[in-house]
Amino acid sequence: ESKMNKGDSKIMKTVYTCFCTDVIHEGHLNIIEQAHKYGRVVVGALSDEALIRYNRFPTISFDERIRMYQELEGVDEVIVQDTIMYDDVIKKLKPDYVVHGDNWREGAESVIRENVLSLLSEYGGELIEVPYTYNEEVKKIDSTLKEKLAMPEYRRKRLKQLIKMCPVVKTIEAHSGLTGLIAEKTVVEENG
């Protein structure tokens, strides 16, 4: 059964976006608002395993994240995205549009963006990039989450999750706050 746009006889188009967050802020709401202008909004909830492999560790359960996304105004459906790459979702859903912040044009996420563009080009889907929202509120939320994840109980939880998921876990030992900070902030980009 297709949803119809209010006052419109056309079948609504499908718009897909993926979230990998435990806290909804202005930027996420902006993504939903922009996506809703184009049609029926389907939000992909990145699974815990995909989040952890992407080096983002959840502070709330997967079910809580799904409920949080479902309760957002403008979201029509929430599905699971099992990998950081969009292949399975795009091949199955064939969205007319994928909406994402423009922050993935450079850096490590640019590979994901290029993959999405390639998948969409196979059937005429379009990528809509929304200017990334980065203001004081967003900075504060990011900072609070980083502080929370730095707490020993969350670090132990992350290590247990990694050991459970991966047969080989890469770790680095740090003997001071400074070396710990260096280890935490180090990013290796391959082929870029």
Describe each model-derived feature in a short phrase.
Residues S2-E153:
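Nucleotidyltransferase catalytic core that binds NTPs
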Residues H28-K37, G180-N191:
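Short amphipathic alpha-helices and their capping/turn segments at secondary-structure boundaries
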Residues L149-V188:
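N-terminal amphipathic alpha-helix/helix-capping segment at the start of soluble metabolic enzymes
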